[in-house]
Regions:
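Active-site nucleophile and cofactor-binding loops and adjacent substrate-binding regions
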Residues: 9-13, 31-38, 97-99, 125, ...
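Glycine-rich phosphate-binding/hydrolytic loop that grips phosphoryl groups
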Residues: 1-2, 40-44, 146-166
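Short, surface-exposed connector motifs at secondary-structure boundaries
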Residues: 2, 25, 90, 112-118, ...
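Adenine-nucleotide phosphate-binding core of ATP-dependent small-molecule kinases
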Residues: 77-111, 150
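Gly/Thr-rich phosphate-binding beta-strand-loop-beta motif of the actin/hexokinase/Hsp70
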Residues: 5-24
Length: 166
């Protein structure tokens, strides 16, 4: 996947994980599962509020100038988005603000550890190149999205099962 030393950032619908790998072995693991603000679920809720799909949210975001979404709680952030819509802010700017907000939340978790030179993005958001781009900016390093990254956990489990049955 990424050689012997890397950080894997897995952003799924329910949680976000940062996994540090040294010499091919997991050395450290962080997870945010207490709040949906840094997950795909947050993006799904905000996309619904804007009346678009997640794919359309990223398309809009790539065309906008990010507005600040200050709330860390999904419910309060949703209220902020509703207010911005009412104020006539563009969907592009709101979408960009939403994506930047999630990327910052993920970056805050990742910054709790010293990241090696190679950072791999897995989970459902690995299929969104714009998210990897924004996360790269937030972390000030290159974040590469894994091909078929949404299946990384399942692929790893299958490889482990195959190894155990040999």
């Amino acid at each position: 996947m990424a050689g012997n030393d890397c950080a894997i950032i897995d952003v799924g619908g329910q949680d976000t994980k940062v996994i540090l790998v040294e010499q091919g072995m997991i050395q450290d693991f962080l997870m945010n599962d207490k709040c949906s603000a840094g997950t795909g679920k947050f993006l799904e809720i905000m996309a619904n509020r804007l009346g678009v799909t997640i794919e359309e949210l990223f398309e809009l975001a790539s065309q906008g100038n990010a507005v600040s979404i200050s709330s860390l709680c999904t419910v309060f952030a949703e209220s902020e988005v509703i207010s911005m819509i009412g104020e006539g802010r563009s969907r592009e700017d709101i979408a960009a603000g939403v994506v930047h907000s999630v990327a910052e939340k993920v970056a805050q978790l990742a910054r709790r550890k010293q990241l090696p030179g190679t950072v791999i993005l897995t989970g459902g958001l690995s299929e969104c190149p714009y998210f990897a781009e924004i996360l790269s900016e937030k972390l000030e390093c290159n974040v590469s999205a894994m091909r078929d990254g949404r299946y990384a956990g399942a692929l790893g489990a299958a490889l482990l099962a195959r190894e155990k049955t040999k």
